[in-house]
Amino acid sequence: MTHCTVPLRLQLTAAVAAAVSLAAASYAAEVNPAAMIYKTPDQFTWRDPTDKATTNNTVLYGDPNGTGLYIYINKFKPGRFGLPHYHPNDRFITVIDGAGWRGTGTVVDPEHAVRLPKGSFSIDHAQKVHWDGTKEENGAYLIAGYGPATNIEVPKGIGPYAGGDPTSLTLKTPDQIEWKNNAGNRTANLVGDPSKTGLYVQMLTWLKGDHFSRPHSHPNDRFIFVLSGTWWAGTGTTFDPANLAIPLKAGSFATHFAKQVHWDGARDEDAALLIIGEGPATNTPAEAGK
């Protein structure tokens, strides 16, 4: 019997080629646009494309000047504070980068502002005067609510600062957010109740270690922003994370369309998501192959 010995160098080359081919196949996965659409941060359209302005914004969904649900991002350069103002409707705000400083009342006093680092959540209550800004760090907010989200300025008060109005803002730093541990993930309901009718805002963290949901659908659209980590998402009834899931990095934004089948989760790192929608967000399992 003749034995053919393959040189170690060729064996290693073949192994590397196979690994690269496998990785390429995995990353070449696509999702069904009827079930899910997404944008990576480099695909966002900013008001100031040069990003030189002190403040900048991009609308992800809806129209803040209209009357329906809207979602947009405001970002700020360091060292700026706005004037006191209010909005006609509640606004729900997640700090997605840097840190914001927030206060209430007509006297803008940065020394009495509350620092909200990345991962914090706040509510601007309707008709209540508040102000915010940045100090040494930049800041970015993801803001959601029902429009119009008009910014109505009020005359700036003359000091001294008298304590503001505690009913104007609801503020939660990351350590104040209450989480519920589930199998493979943890959730925090920030606004509303996903099981009931009405607007809800929820944080969901998929835990690392190949934790995934199985194919399912929801009765209403859901809007997802990746806060940190890499989120893996797929569509259709075939559950195959190794070959059919796409990776969405932090800062990406996606829509899961109503009654369309999808699945998602995390691989080798936690994936933290912000989910916004109108309930109920019932999870309906899909039948394989249908």
Task: Please place each PLM-identified region on the residue numbering.
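Bacterial N-terminal signal peptides that target proteins for export
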Residues: 2-14
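Glycine- and acidic-residue-biased ligand/ion/polar-headgroup-sensing regions
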Residues: 77-80, 87-107, 208-210, 217-239
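N-terminal post-signal-peptidase region of extra-cytosolic proteins
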Residues: 57-60, 71-80, 109, 188-189, ...
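Ligand-binding loop in jelly-roll beta-barrel domains
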Residues: 126-149, 247-249, 258-282
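Short beta-strand His + acidic residue motifs that chelate non-heme Fe in jelly-roll/DSBH
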Residues: 82-84, 102-103, 124, 129-135, ...
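Short acidic-glycine-tyrosine-enriched beta hairpin
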Residues: 63-66, 100, 106-128, 193, ...
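Bacterial N-terminal signal peptides
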Residues: 13-23
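A short, N-terminal "cap"/entry segment at the start of jelly-roll beta-barrel domains
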Residues: 27-70, 151-200, 288-290
